[in-house]
Regions:
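ATP-hydrolysis module of ASCE/P-loop NTPase motor domains
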Residues: 17-18, 83-86, 105-199, 226, ...
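P-loop NTPase Walker
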Residues: 1-109, 115, 216-220, 250
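Accessory N-terminal region flanking or inserted into the helicase ATPase core
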Residues: 1-25, 30, 34-41, 53-55, ...
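Accessory C-terminal helicase-associated subdomains
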Residues: 179, 373, 471-583
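Helicase P-loop NTPase motor core
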Residues: 23-24, 30-36, 51, 285-289, ...
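Conserved short internal alpha-helix adjacent to the catalytic or cofactor-binding core
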Residues: 99, 342-348, 363, 394-395, ...
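Conserved RecA-like helicase ATPase core segment
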Residues: 2-6, 12, 42-45, 127, ...
């Protein structure tokens, strides 16, 4: 008898419904991850399915790691010894990349290909913008602005076209001149990818789909092997992802999708709610079992009641049409009726005085802690429309100054952290020619904000290295500054090597010696320094900088600070996100 644990009746049905098409409509907080974990274990324990015969696609890498960890733990508790890593678990992009890697010789890619992230892609287009600016009709396609802004627009077009599997030849032969321009843009970009042995996130899925469609044997082998497919967050899938799912599941038809049509958030990325609404009708003459999960285990009844009232209002003057026909009817139920007298959500505001607002929030938090309603600050969450807003980051800084650590890795605070400003300042001091030009504001590409930031970095570095207990660091910086200023030959190091040498000195050595088992906020400086080395290393790779040469050191240094780091600064960088509890 399979042990379902604390599963409710609907969850038990979803866990044991293994064959054919299964649609699990999972409202917020209804235990969908719990259900998926139990379902995978059920397939292995009760149905005798091997891990490599199961594919589970999630929306984020973090969700994939959580699935792997929880499935591994669940199997261990049942004394079932299998290698969970043999399962196809990951995001659509990572799963497609795995299929590509396993069959690389059948793709356009060669060994040692490079995967572009979002910034890499934009930077590639920016550095090759001359190839696009002469395309007929490009000025009508793009808005006015600088090359970086227009490169971003080009990438947006490219990604949408790639993920919708639009045919380039059809674009280029279209009667509409604007469509023909798009076709030429996509053609030029794909030529760049092929020449550079590159692949980006939007083309991973396209390359995988082409591989499967053009190689019948590979497709049939995968169709034979992958007997059970489970797709999470199905409401956020796009056209090409849907095509890949039904291509891989075409033989066994054992496809289970989990999602909530009321939580479709990613239309701007090409996702379509149509996928989940039309899923039950995908295979003719085959039924689809629809299992709604409606018991919410996360929120109290006040929040659930508000949600039900809000989400069920589908017509009225605020709506362009009645959209109740475009959703699965459901009513979420709280697991336990709330007996908490205090409100779950509190709004704290002041009219215009930011200092008063800060003090009011700090006082409220301290009151919660002192009364015992909070045992740990991580039980408190702040909701903002954007964590990157200046008002929000100012609040975070205020709370941290008052002893309350804040975890907000996506607030783009990377370049504002003390350890990063000090490291960049020390690095700049070792290139005195660059610092001299910076002081004279001789760089056209830098704006007032960038000059101000780099000056702050240099001031922070100067103040630190001139302290009496930092003589060795000061000597190190002066020695390399003198060497770089008069360099005529070639060194045996470049920027990343210089950074590693710098990290031998305090405070960087102390930061890197931090015990990694401490809290996420305590290891943030360590992670940030590690990220900085990756950023500098990527610059060296992109610009083929292995060593310093007297002929190129000044130009490359200006490229590093005035272009590469400047663009990263403008775009913002997320900090390390804690995934310690996952595999």
């Amino acid at each position: 008898m399979f042990n379902y644990g604390n599963a409710n009746e609907a969850q038990k049905e979803a866990i044991s419904a293994t064959d054919g098409l299964v649609l699990i409509t999972a409202g917020p907080g209804t235990g969908k991850t719990f259900t998926l974990v139990k379902r995978a274990v059920y397939l292995i324990q009760e149905c005798g399915i091997k891990p490599e015969q199961i594919m589970m696609a999630t929306f984020t890498e973090k969700a994939a790691k959580e699935l792997i960890t929880r499935i591994t733990n669940e199997l261990a508790e049942r004394n079932i010894s299998v290698n969970v890593n043999e399962m196809y678990i990951g995001t659509f992009h990572s799963l497609c990349l795995r299929i590509i890697k396993e069959n690389l010789e059948f793709t356009r890619l060669k060994r040692n290909y490079r995967l572009l992230d979002t910034f890499d892609q934009k930077y590639l287009v920016f550095r090759n913008f001359h190839k696009f600016k002469n395309i007929e009709g490009i000025d009508e396609l793009l808005s006015k602005g600088g090359s970086w802004k227009r490169s971003d627009e080009i990438c947006t077009y490219i990604n949408h076209l790639s993920e919708e599997m639009v045919d380039i030849e059809a674009l280029q032969s279209d009667d509409n001149p604007g469509i023909r321009t798009l076709g030429r843009v996509l053609s030029v970009y794909q030529e760049m990818l092929e020449e550079g042995n590159l692949i980006d996130f939007s083309t991973i899925q396209t390359e995988c789909y082409k591989l499967l469609m053009q190689n019948k044997q590979i497709l049939e082998e995968l169709q034979d092997k992958l007997q059970y497919l489970m797709i999470d967050e199905y409401q956020d899938t796009n056209y090409i992802q849907e095509q890949i799912v039904f291509l891989l599941g075409a033989k066994h038809h054992n496809i289970c999708v989990v999602g909530d049509d009321d939580q479709g958030l990613y239309r701007f990325r090409g996702a379509t709610i149509r996928n989940i609404l039309e899923f039950p009708h995908k295979f003719e003459n085959e039924g689809c079992k629809i299992i709604p999960l409606v018991v919410n285990y996360r929120s109290n009844s006040d929040i659930v009641d508000f949600y039900n009232e809000w989400i069920s209002t589908t017509s009225g003057h605020k709506f362009k049409f009645s959209w109740d026909r475009y959703r699965y009817q459901k009513k979420i139920e709280p697991h336990v009726k709330s007996d908490i007298q205090s409100p779950a959500v509190v709004k704290l505001f002041s009219k215009d005085d930011e200092d008063e607002w800060h003090e009011k929030i700090l006082g409220f938090i301290k009151e919660l802690k002192e009364s015992g309603k909070l045992t740990d600050y991580n039980q408190l969450a702040f909701l903002f429309s954007s964590v990157k807003h200046q008002r929000v980051t100012a609040l975070a800084n205020f709370l941290e100054r008052n002893g309350i650590n804040v975890y907000s890795p996506r607030s783009d605070m990377f370049f504002k952290r003390d350890e990063i400003k000090l490291a960049l300042g020390c690095l700049m001091l070792m290139f005195p020619k660059y610092v001299m030009k910076l002081e004279k504001q001789e760089f056209d590409f830098l704006q007032v904000e960038h000059y101000r930031y780099y000056r702050e970095c240099i001031v922070a570095a100067n103040e630190y290295v001139t302290r009496a207990d930092n003589k060795e660091l000061l000597q190190f910086i002066r020695k390399h500054g003198k060497a770089h200023a008069g360099l005529t030959g070639t060194t045996d190091y470049a920027y990343s090597g210089l950074l590693y040498k710098l990290f031998m000195f305090r405070p960087f050595s102390d930061i890197l010696d931090t015990d990694m088992s401490v809290g996420v906020v305590d290891i943030r400086p360590t992670r940030n320094l590690a990220l900085l080395t990756q950023i500098i290393g990527k610059f060296e790779y992109l610009h083929r900088v292995d060593v310093f040469n007297g002929s190129y050191i000044d130009r490359n240094t200006e490229l590093l600070f005035n272009l590469y780091l400047k663009l990263l600064y403008d775009g913002g960088i997320s900090e390390y996100e804690d995934e310690a509890e996952y595999a």
